[in-house]
């Protein structure tokens, strides 16, 4: 009996000893805020060599797995703080507080600089970049060296790469639609911005599976945390008609729960749909593209959308996220959009075929009405031993387009598309010592009925598509050598009905092993993808081999390089072999082959970057080559003012080369940021039209300089330009110049803004068009009130026109602009 009791006691003690994990949090001793990216090393006694190390996460937390803690010390270092050593304590949460201090980095003493670097985290002190003229977070982010914000979409990129995650206090309240934060969160509420390179959002995969993800995390000022911030705004004005806008939003951003609720209405040209765009994608599952057989009219112009958009938009967005503890969180979002647009536009196109030259003329007056509803529920359990996430999404969208056409055609076109989507993403992983395994499952269903009517044509197409991908994941990593295997089965059921039923189903079995070697800052890997594919209705089956080789090497904390080469095989999407003739729009008839083609593509990439964040210097260079080989071309035949697209069997190889470099530099003493992006692109391939197959070549060059300067507290200025030139083998060089210059003058009480734009577009080698635009704004602040008045399009420009090239085609597009408009508005925050 005594022996049994002694055995059980010993077993219990052993289990307790194994559970003595060392956990803790690193914070600032003055502000008590967590320090992200601090280096924590585990030592035995006072030995200089360490047993293990960790980097603190977005909550400042770290964990070591140790069965014995006696005699162990923890050493914590962080840029700008004094180093600290404390005894390791197992079984309970440790708190390590660091004291701010001046530091020395490679013989350079830095004290309270604007940018600091620690491991893979770059921290921007936004107080050193902000001014009273910044109205929201987006305005500050534009000023940060190394970071760029797209003027129209709002997409944020770092060193030329789009960010993959956007956090506020370590949480993603919008599920990737971060424009809602950037447009609605006040600039003075944010304390710092952190760029986290090689970000691994799954804790159980950290230090196991490196990534190229880039995350942006915003840290709020203490007085802005937790409390509700309410903001309301209303404006009225007049141009050719009465215009208005209105906004009401409430924001609460804490560490355990966050909420963002917004209602907006606009009839002044502002594109509210950009706030619904999901700009981050961090899931391994991507469904097959849904065949889209009818073209809904769109537009793309170098101008800001607000100068072109004639809209009546209402947006309601509700976002809420709860963090139950360190690892569990729930997120819910609801979004509704009602958008009506009127667009008056046109184009003159010329097709330069060897056998014929074709000219077309289109004038279009569109009325576009869109209704969208989206609901998301996201549950996540993100622990160090296991990970589980489930995302459920429902979205419904209805679009109705009424178009009046003139030019080559005089007719009315009506398009209606309804799209209903349901999706579920599930991912679970488990860790045990050197092993990781898990299951991923993805389900997606789409129902897409569409209707196209013009003249004597009445076309209705119904589409149902169900897609699933289910995979098993296993990883073993030891001594720098890793074997990662992803294998599974995916299937697609596609039903098309256009008078008769057509099926385009597909089944795949795949294995994707990843054999990697990692030593210090060097990593290389080989991924020999193998896919078996079957199309049952078409009676075709094939085996694809698509290998990928990659190398990544960090030469130093400043310099890194990576290269990759891949060979891919894949089959076409269903619209490429859908046999029933159909109209895409009023002048494009499609008659494709029934054979499924195998497409082979090769890609090669070389990327290098150099950065000195303390010196506010960032530079990248990217070289890319991509080529595609296939046995069919799309042949264009111009018949009776209609374009008829058919499949032509002819070997074709398309090649593309691109060089892209971005240089960004901040000047602390001048409070200035300057950047330059340079791109050269070359492409060649075959184009089939009017019974002839001909070779085309394209050259495109672009230079984009940008400057943001705040010389004093009462003056800020910005300048950006783009100089682009393009030519083809059959067409001469055309160059366009875009320039924007803006000034903000004032103080905390009042502010005046001046903005000028110049567009010089070559319409033809002998004709160019200059467009001058100007805006004036005035703002007065008193307490919680903000009054503003704006005069837009001062010179009352009516139309914008430009020309560009594509393969053997040149096209000149024009679009009606918003007229001269004046607007006054008032804003109140509490």
Q: PLM features: residue spans?
A:
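Short, ordered, surface-exposed loop/turn motifs in non-cytosolic proteins
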Residues: 30-44
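Membrane-proximal, glycine/serine-rich, low-complexity loop/turn segments characteristic
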Residues: 20, 25, 29-32, 59-61, ...
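Outer-membrane beta-barrel translocator domains and adjoining extracellular loop/strand segments
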Residues: 206-208, 272-278, 342-359, 392, ...
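Short, acidic Ser/Thr/Gly-rich low-complexity loop/linker segments typical of extracellular
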Residues: 46-61
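Conserved C-terminal beta-signal and adjacent last beta-strands/turns
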Residues: 702-830
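A short, solvent-exposed loop/turn motif at the edges and junctions
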Residues: 44-49, 71-86
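Face-selective signature of the C-terminal outer-membrane beta-barrel domain
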Residues: 321-339, 367-538, 542-547, 554, ...
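Short Pro-Gly-centered beta-turn/loop motif in secreted/extracellular proteins
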Residues: 35-36, 63-71, 88
């Amino acid at each position: 009996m005594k022996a049994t009791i002694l055995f059980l006691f010993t077993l219990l003690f052993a289990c307790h000893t194994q559970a003595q994990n060392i956990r803790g949090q690193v914070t600032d001793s003055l502000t008590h805020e967590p320090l992200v990216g601090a280096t924590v090393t585990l030592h035995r006694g006072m030995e200089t060599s360490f047993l293990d190390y960790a980097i603190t996460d977005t909550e400042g937390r770290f964990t070591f797995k140790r069965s014995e803690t006696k005699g162990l010390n923890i050493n914590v270092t962080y840029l700008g703080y004094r180093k600290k050593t404390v005894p390791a304590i197992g079984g309970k949460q440790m708190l390590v507080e660091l004291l701010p201090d001046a530091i020395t980095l490679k013989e350079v003493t830095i004290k309270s600089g604007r940018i600091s670097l620690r491991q893979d985290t770059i921290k921007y002190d936004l107080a050193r970049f902000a001014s009273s003229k910044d109205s929201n977070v987006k305005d500050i982010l534009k000023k940060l060296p190394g970071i760029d914000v797209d003027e129209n979409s709002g997409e944020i990129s770092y060193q030329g790469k789009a960010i993959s995650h956007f956090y506020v206090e370590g949480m993603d309240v919008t599920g990737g639609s971060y424009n809602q934060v950037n447009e609605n969160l006040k600039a003075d509420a944010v304390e710092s911005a952190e760029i986290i390179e090689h970000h691994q959002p799954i804790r159980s995969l950290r230090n196991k599976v490196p990534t190229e993800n880039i995350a942006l995390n915003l840290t709020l000022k203490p007085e802005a945390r937790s409390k509700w911030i309410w903001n309301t705004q209303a404006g009225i004005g007049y141009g050719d008609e009465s215009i208005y806008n209105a906004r009401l939003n409430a924001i609460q951003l804490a560490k355990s729960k966050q909420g963002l609720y917004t209602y907006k209405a606009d009839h002044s040209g502002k594109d509210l749909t950009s706030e619904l765009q999901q700009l981050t994608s961090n899931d391994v599952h991507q469904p097959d593209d849904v065949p889209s057989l009818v073209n809904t009219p769109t537009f793309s112009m170098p101008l800001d959308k607000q100068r072109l958009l004639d809209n009546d938009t209402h947006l309601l967005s509700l976002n809420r996220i709860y963090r139950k503890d360190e690892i569990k969180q729930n997120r819910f979002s609801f979004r509704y959009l009602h958008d009506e647009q009127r667009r008056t536009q046109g184009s003159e196109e010329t097709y330069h075929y060897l056998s014929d030259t074709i000219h077309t003329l289109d004038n279009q007056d569109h009325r576009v009405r869109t209704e969208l509803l989206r609901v998301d529920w996201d549950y996540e359990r993100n622990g160090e031993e296991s990970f589980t996430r489930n995302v459920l999404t429902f979205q419904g969208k209805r679009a109705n387009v009424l178009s009046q056409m003139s030019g080559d055609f005089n007719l009315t076109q009506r398009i209606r598309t309804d799209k209903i989507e349901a999706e579920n993403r599930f991912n679970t992983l488990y860790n045990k010592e050197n092993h990781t395994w898990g299951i991923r499952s993805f389900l997606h269903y789409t129902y897409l009925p569409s209707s196209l009517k013009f003249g004597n044509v009445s076309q209705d197409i119904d589409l149902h598509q169900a897609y699933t991908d289910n995979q098993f994941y296993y990883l073993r990593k030891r001594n720098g050598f890793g074997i990662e295997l992803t294998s599974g089965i995916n299937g697609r059921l596609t039903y098309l009905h256009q008078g008769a039923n057509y099926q385009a189903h597909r089944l795949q079995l795949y294995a994707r092993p990843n054999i990697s070697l990692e030593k210090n800052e060097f990593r290389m890997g080989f991924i020999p993808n193998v896919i078996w594919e079957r199309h049952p209705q078409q009676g075709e089956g094939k085996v694809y081999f698509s290998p990928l080789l990659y190398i990544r090497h960090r030469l130093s904390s400043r310099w890194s390089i990576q290269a990759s080469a891949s060979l891919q095989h894949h089959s076409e999407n269903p619209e490429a072999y859908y046999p029933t003739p159909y109209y895409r729009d009023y002048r494009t008839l499609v008659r494709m082959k029934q054979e499924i083609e195998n497409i082979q593509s090769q890609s090669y990439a070389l990327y290098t970057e150099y950065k000195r964040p303390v010196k506010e210097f960032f530079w990248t260079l990217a070289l890319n080559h991509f080529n595609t080989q296939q046995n069919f071309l799309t042949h264009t035949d111009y018949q009776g003012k209609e374009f008829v697209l058919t499949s032509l069997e002819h070997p074709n190889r398309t090649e593309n080369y691109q060089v892209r470099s971005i240089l960004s530099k901040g000047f602390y003493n001048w409070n200035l940021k300057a950047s330059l992006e340079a791109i050269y692109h070359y492409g060649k391939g075959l184009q089939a039209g009017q019974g002839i197959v001909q070779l085309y070549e394209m050259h495109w060059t672009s230079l984009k300089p940008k400057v943001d300067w705040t010389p004093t507290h009462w003056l800020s200025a910005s300048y950006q330009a783009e100089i682009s030139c393009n030519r083809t083998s059959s067409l001469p060089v055309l160059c366009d110049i875009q320039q924007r210059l803006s000034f903000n003058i004032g103080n905390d009480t009042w502010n005046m803004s001046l903005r000028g734009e110049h567009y010089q577009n070559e319409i033809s080698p002998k004709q160019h068009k200059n467009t001058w635009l100007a805006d004036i704004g005035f703002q007065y602040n008193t307490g919680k009130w903000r009054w503003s008045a704006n005069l837009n399009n001062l010179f009352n420009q009516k139309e914008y026109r430009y020309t560009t090239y594509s393969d053997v085609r040149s096209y000149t597009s024009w679009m009606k602009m918003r007229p001269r408009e004046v607007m006054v508005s008032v804003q109140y925050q509490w």
